[in-house]
Amino acid sequence: MNKNGFSRCADIYIGRLREEGRYSTAHVYQNALLSFSKFCGVHSVSFRQVTRDRLRRYEQHLYECGLKPNTISTYMRMLRSIYNRGVEAGSAPYVHRLFHEVYTGVDVRQKRALPVVA
C-alpha cells in the first residue's frame, strides 16, 4: 500500500475533475484535502492516518475554527468520497462505518435573505 495513498488518490481524482471541466467541485475537494493535511501536520496523508478518532478530532477542530455545520459536512463528505475511491481501487483497507461518528448530513435552515416582494 502506498504510504501517501490518500493524498495521491485525492490528487488523481481532483485532476480528473479538472479535465472534465468540473473546476468548482475540484476546488472543494482540494480545500478539504488541504485542510485535513494541515490538521494532520503532513503534506501527504496516508490511508492509515484516516481513522475514526482523527476524523472526530478534525471535526471538533473545524467547529473550534468557526466553520458552519454544512461546511464541515461538505469537507467530511469529500474525504469520505476519496476514501471510498481508495477502497474501490484496492489502495485502502475497508473500515466499516469509518465516517459514522462525524456529521455528513445537510443542515437545512431558513435563509437570512429578505424575500423578494413582487
Give the residues covered by each predicted segment.
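Structured, charged N-terminal subsegments at the starts of enzyme catalytic cores
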Residues: 9, 28-31
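N-terminal core-binding DNA-recognition domain of tyrosine recombinases/integrases
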Residues: 12-24, 33-110
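Short, intrinsically disordered, charge-balanced linker/junction segments flanking boundaries
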Residues: 108-118
